[in-house]
A protein has these predicted regions:
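Structured alpha/beta reader/binder surfaces that contact nucleic acids or chromatin modification marks
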Residues: 2-152
Length: 152
């Protein structure tokens, strides 16, 4: 299967930056934000700059520029966001070869996650911003935690 990279044509993202922000950059007039549920160790690795790809079995249909990060239990809070540099779609073996150096997961975990799938997706992470104060998802956004993602 041929691989593809979906570039974000609206914004060029330079080197990753780690900033702290008191409020999210959410602009509801533009449907360019998605909320992702991410397990605590993977979310922490993203904010430390160790994990540069977020893997998904299903991907957005709309263009997404910013991912709002909801850390799952036991934290259960929105803690920050990151810019989407691109989305890579490829067969699972090729996807691992292309992303493994900054995957933030070992090969066993990667292939277990994609078991039974031919194609996988990797969201290339650009600049990251951790909020000064985590936000309660339902109180702040009026939604419940998504199984995978939802558009904001």
């Amino acid at each position: 299967m041929a691989s593809s990279v979906m570039q974000n044509p609206r914004r060029e993202v330079s080197s990753p930056s780690r900033k702290t922000s008191s409020k999210p950059s959410l602009d509801l007039r533009r449907q360019t934000h998605a909320l992702l549920s991410i397990r605590p160790p993977f979310a922490e690795a993203i904010f430390r700059g160790e994990k540069r790809f977020e893997f998904r079995r299903a991907i957005f249909r709309k263009e997404v520029e910013t991912v709002v990060v909801y850390i799952t239990s036991p934290i259960s809070m929105v803690v920050g966001e990151f810019d989407v540099k691109s989305v890579i779609s490829d067969d699972v073996v090729s996807l691992w070869e292309r992303t493994r150096s900054k995957a933030g997961i070992d090969s066993d975990g990667f292939f277990k996650y994609f078991a039974g799938r031919e194609v996988g997706y990797a969201i290339a992470i650009g600049g990251v911003r951790r909020y000064v104060k985590p936000l309660e998802l339902e109180a702040h956004y009026g939604v419940r935690p998504p199984q995978s993602f939802l558009y904001l």
